[in-house]
A protein has these predicted regions:
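Conserved alpha-helical scaffold segments that buttress catalytic/binding sites
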Residues: 1-141
C-alpha cells in the first residue's frame, strides 16, 4: 500500500452568499488589495462583509467522518499552513502516491496546462503533482 496525503482547505466549510466573493490565486492583488476593496465597498454600502460568509455545520462532524473513512498510522504527521501549496512539498517529501483533497477549489491550475511555466501556488499544486508524475491519483471532494 502506498502513502496518501489528506489535504483539507478550510474554505471547504465556508458557504459564500455572493459568488463574486471567491478567492482565486494567492498574491497581493487577491489576498490584500481585492479583499480590502471588498471590505471598503461593503462599508460604503453599510453592509457587514462577514454576513456574506457562513461556516458549514459539517465542520463539527468532519473529523469523526474522516476517522471512519481513513486508517491513520500512529506516527502520522500533521501540518497546518496558511497556504495550501505546502501540500505540494509534503507529497514530494513523503513520496505520496495518492492525494485526498477536501477543498472548495480543485487546485489543478487555472491558467495553463503547462505546469512547468508557473511556480507552485495554492491554485495549481495538485495539478503540478499530477503533471510531474509525483502522484498517481487524486480524489477531490
Amino acid at each position: 500500500m502506498g502513502r496518501g496525503l489528506l489535504s483539507v482547505d478550510w474554505d471547504y466549510f465556508i458557504s459564500v452568499k455572493d459568488k463574486c466573493f471567491g478567492s482565486y490565486v494567492e498574491n497581493n492583488r487577491t489576498r490584500v488589495d481585492l479583499w480590502y476593496k471588498r471590505y471598503l465597498l461593503c462599508k460604503k454600502q453599510n453592509k457587514n462583509i462577514y454576513s456574506y460568509f457562513k461556516l458549514s455545520e459539517d465542520v463539527n462532524r468532519f473529523w469523526d467522518q474522516i476517522k471512519r473513512a481513513f486508517i491513520f498510522d500512529n506516527k502520522i504527521n500533521v501540518y497546518v499552513s496558511d497556504s495550501h501549496k505546502l501540500s505540494y512539498y509534503i507529497a514530494k517529501a513523503f513520496s505520496c502516491d495518492t492525494v485526498y483533497l477536501f477543498d472548495a477549489h480543485a487546485d489543478l491550475g487555472y491558467a495553463s496546462d503547462r505546469f512547468d511555466e508557473f511556480e507552485v501556488n495554492c491554485s495549481n499544486w495538485l495539478g503540478k503533482l499530477l503533471a510531474e508524475g509525483v502522484i498517481e491519483k487524486a480524489y477531490i471532494v
